[in-house]
Amino acid sequence: MGNDEEDENTSEPNNRLIIYYDKSEGNKALMRAIEKKGCTIMYNYKNFSGVAIKLPKGWDIDKAIVYFKKIKGVTTVNKDNTYQLQ
């Protein structure tokens, strides 16, 4: 309950995005934008032409979505969600 790791994991979906890109255009512009903004790549979905990223602290997720949607080749930007099974 007071576990720092648990607290960190429960808050993480609020600062993670899944970004899909057009495979024919590639992901170079997206990768440069991710690096420029100080984001962390959590997973690279090669079969789906997408990446899961963690935003740096202090960057509003809605502003990040708008930013990444403008990057050349990006097709979709979604908030990452975690669901608990009951």
Report residues per predicted region.
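Bacterial Sec-dependent signal peptides at the C-terminal "C-region" and cleavage site
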Residues: 1-9
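Short, low-complexity disordered segments enriched in Ser/Pro/Gly and basic
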Residues: 9-15, 46-48
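Hydrophobic beta-strand residues in large extracellular and virion-surface proteins
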Residues: 17-19, 34, 39-41, 53
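Autoinhibitory propeptides
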Residues: 40-86
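Extracytoplasmic/secreted envelope proteins and their assembly/folding machinery
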Residues: 27, 31-34, 62-65
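Short, surface-exposed ligand-recognition loops at beta-strand->loop->(often short) alpha-helix junctions
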Residues: 17-28, 57
